[in-house]
Amino acid sequence: MKAKLLVLLCALSATDADTICIGYHANNSTDTVDTVLEKNVTVTHSVNLLEDNHNGKLCKLKGIAPLQLGKCSIAGWILGNPECESLFSKKSWSYIAETPNSENGTCYPGYFADYEELREQLSSVSSFERFEIFPKESSWPKHNVTKGVTAACSHKGKSSFYRNLLWLTEKNGSYPNLSKSYVNNKEKEVLVLWGVHHPSNIEDQKTIYRKENAYVSVVSSHYNRRFTPEIAKRPKVRNQEGRINYYWTLLEPGDTIIFEANGNLIAPWYAFALSRGFGSGIITSNASMDECDAKCQTPQGAINSSLPFQNVHPVTIGECPKYVRSTKLRMVTGLRNIPSIQSRGLFGAIAGFIEGGWTGMIDGWYGYHHQNEQGSGYAADQKSTQNAINGITNKVNSIIEKMNTQFTAVGKEFNKLEKRMENLNKKVDDGFLDIWTYNAELLVLLENERTLDFHDSNVKNLYEKVKSQLKNNAKEIGNGCFEFYHKCNNECMESVKNGTYDYPKYSEESKLNREKIDGVKLESMGVYQILAIYSTVASSLVLLVSLGAISFWMCSNGSLQCRICI
């Protein structure tokens, strides 16, 4: 019996064996990502794909200043509203910035035909040449070119008129028929603007044009229209009962435009030879101009970012990330960040069998921790770590490139559709944005899932690599660890890590230690059986004595009557 108790004590007080564990890196990162199956997974490393910051300013784009219209609208600028004279010196720009409620537009009330289409055309123009298409003094010798002014277009307290148009009126009591043509020799598209006056009464018609019935005809190879003034009393706008309707056309190089009229023509004075540039545009913004330079401009402010997506604003000019409605697009590049809990011990489930990562391993993603008589320490597996880094880096770069290529192509297609259809329905725009957002989010979710699975697989592969080397020279003790059946010094540990472990060298020692441990287990089982019997008998005796004592006490105080019948 004494021998058996001695064996039990030996089993309970066995010394710590040499161990090696497979694990992964952990740190103090609080980055979280979403996957297809999980939300807010904490990871060691990740990259943000969504830009949500701007500077709140209007900036130059690649060193080129925008054309800031200030209090003028596109209409006021291009027609030549007298209050917009300061803009006439601007010959080129990176984009056009217009305020939401511009004061100076069409100073004389009337309808601007195809105004939205004109804005669309000007949005792709980065510079123009403003030139006299019909010089004021020499083009209209039989008509008055100075009396056509109005208080509605006053400038510095005096009646005036548009700086790019001429209001032709009677001269010396007559308004002769006119015919004027222009041949576009600019080798560029030329924007030509004109107007047709609609008086409020016949008296004004006779006074200004000396006839009751008049017409205006404008003809080119792509434009053919005849206008008849509509004389009618109208509500006053800017103290005017009359109206001027404004028209425009684009004249191709070599094409000719012909104006014929016998009254009511608001003639072109200046025209514009257009130079189109990729990346120009028109934005409506209250942001102020600043001395800054950027690659991307939105109505909210400038963005300086190389990220593929942004949620600042759907309207962008320049080299901009694609707009999506997402609030978070973060792609994982590292591992699940689950630092090991001290109460569980050092090792401890990224791959399903390891409970936590190691903050002590800082030079790699996957690696080892060993413990022997010479001490303990961490060592990263550089090969598997570097292969993983290369693979994930290439994948992230490829995905970003695919995202940019995909959405840029879609963006170009929509721009073409906008010109053909003139206006995209807002619901259609919203639908496309939803598709872009869904595609971006789904792609990130799928790739995050794949990356985390990839890390799991790498840890498992490292574990299987060690297991296949050690075979039965060590036993699996859980949490990614192995306990050696033999002494394993630092040289031995290094051989396991680099894949050169000599299994036969340690087989005999392992076999002997394994047999000893198995013997101890068998002896221990016998001892445990004896202890179990003793424990059962002792417990029964204690129970019987307790019951007897209680019965005696109850009989003595009359709570329990005992009768013996013979």
UniProtKB/Swiss-Prot annotation:
Q: Where are the transmembrane segments?
A: 530-550
Q: Where in the cell is it found?
A: Virion membrane; Host apical cell membrane
A single Gene Ontology CC annotation of this entry is: viral envelope
List the GO biological process terms. clathrin-dependent endocytosis of virus by host cell; fusion of virus membrane with host endosome membrane; fusion of virus membrane with host plasma membrane; viral budding from plasma membrane; virion attachment to host cell
Disulfide-linked positions:
C21-C481, C59-C292, C72-C84, C107-C153, C296-C320, C488-C492
- Membrane topology category: Single-pass type I membrane protein
Q: Where is this site: Cleavage?
A: R344, G345
Q: Where is the lipid attached (S-palmitoyl cysteine)?
A: C555, C562, C565
In this entry, the parts of the chain located on the Cytoplasmic side of the membrane are 551-566
GO molecular function list: host cell surface receptor binding
Glycosylated residues are N27, N28, N40, N104, N144, N172, N177, N286, N304, N498
Function of the protein: Binds to sialic acid-containing receptors on the cell surface, bringing about the attachment of the virus particle to the cell. This attachment induces virion internalization either through clathrin-dependent endocytosis or through clathrin- and caveolin-independent pathway. Plays a major role in the determination of host range restriction and virulence. Class I viral fusion protein. Responsible for penetration of the virus into the cell cytoplasm by mediating the fusion of the membrane of the endocytosed virus particle with the endosomal membrane.
Other notes on this protein?
Major glycoprotein, comprises over 80% of the envelope proteins present in virus particle. The extent of infection into host organism is determined by HA. Influenza viruses bud from the apical surface of polarized epithelial cells (e.g. bronchial epithelial cells) into lumen of lungs and are therefore usually pneumotropic. The reason is that HA is cleaved by tryptase clara which is restricted to lungs. However, HAs of H5 and H7 pantropic avian viruses subtypes can be cleaved by furin and subtilisin-type enzymes, allowing the virus to grow in other organs than lungs.
Tell me the HAMAP family matching this sequence: INFV_HEMA
Kindly provide the name given to this protein in its UniProt entry: Hemagglutinin
Lineage of the organism: Viruses, Riboviria, Orthornavirae, Negarnaviricota, Polyploviricotina
